[in-house]
């Protein structure tokens, strides 16, 4: 039985669900390729593959909001990864929120329900 995710599926990109190790709150959804997987295992820090920039990146490399791995789970088909992490800085979202899922959809409207931890204009000065 293989112990690694099956990167032969989905053009080598697998979805990664990221949860807080403290309270199981869903923080974000990202993608990993085999390189990101191995870098994550080597460093103990979450690394992902950016589909838009087409490059490897470490979560928090610009913001300092690094994700330290506490536990890794794989689904039954070995094609989805669940990371339980300790989120440094309190924000997983590049918009400055604790979770990327900071908006609730109801009655055809979006309502901000998450807590903003930082101003992205201050953190990502480009």
Swiss-Prot record:
Cofactor field: Mg(2+); Zn(2+)
Disulfide cysteine pairs (residue numbers): none
Alphabetical UniProt keywords: Amino-acid biosynthesis, Cytoplasm, Histidine biosynthesis, Hydrolase, Magnesium, Metal-binding, Zinc
GO biological process: L-histidine biosynthetic process
Catalysed reactions, semicolon-separated: 1-(5-phospho-beta-D-ribosyl)-5'-AMP + H2O = 1-(5-phospho-beta-D-ribosyl)-5-[(5-phospho-beta-D-ribosylamino)methylideneamino]imidazole-4-carboxamide
Cofactor detail note: Binds 1 Mg(2+) ion per subunit.
EC annotation from Swiss-Prot or TrEMBL: 3.5.4.19
Main location: cytoplasm
GO molecular function per UniProt: magnesium ion binding; phosphoribosyl-AMP cyclohydrolase activity; zinc ion binding
Role: Catalyzes the hydrolysis of the adenine ring of phosphoribosyl-AMP.
Family according to the record: Belongs to the PRA-CH family.
Name listed for the protein in its UniProt record: Phosphoribosyl-AMP cyclohydrolase
């Amino acid at each position: 039985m293989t112990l690694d995710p099956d990167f032969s599926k989905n053009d080598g990109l697998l979805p990664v669900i990221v949860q807080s190790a403290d309270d199981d709150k869903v923080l974000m959804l990202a993608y990993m390729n085999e390189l990101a997987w191995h870098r994550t295992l080597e460093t103990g820090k979450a690394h992902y593959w950016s589909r838009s920039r087409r490059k490897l990146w470490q979560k928090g490399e610009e913001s300092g909001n690094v994700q330290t791995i506490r536990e890794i789970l794989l689904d039954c088909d070995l094609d989805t990864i669940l990371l339980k992490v300790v989120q440094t800085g309190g924000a997983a979202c590049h918009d400055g929120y604790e979770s990327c899922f900071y908006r609730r959809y109801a009655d055809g409207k979006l309502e901000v329900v998450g807590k903003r931890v930082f101003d992205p204009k201050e953190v990502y000065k480009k």
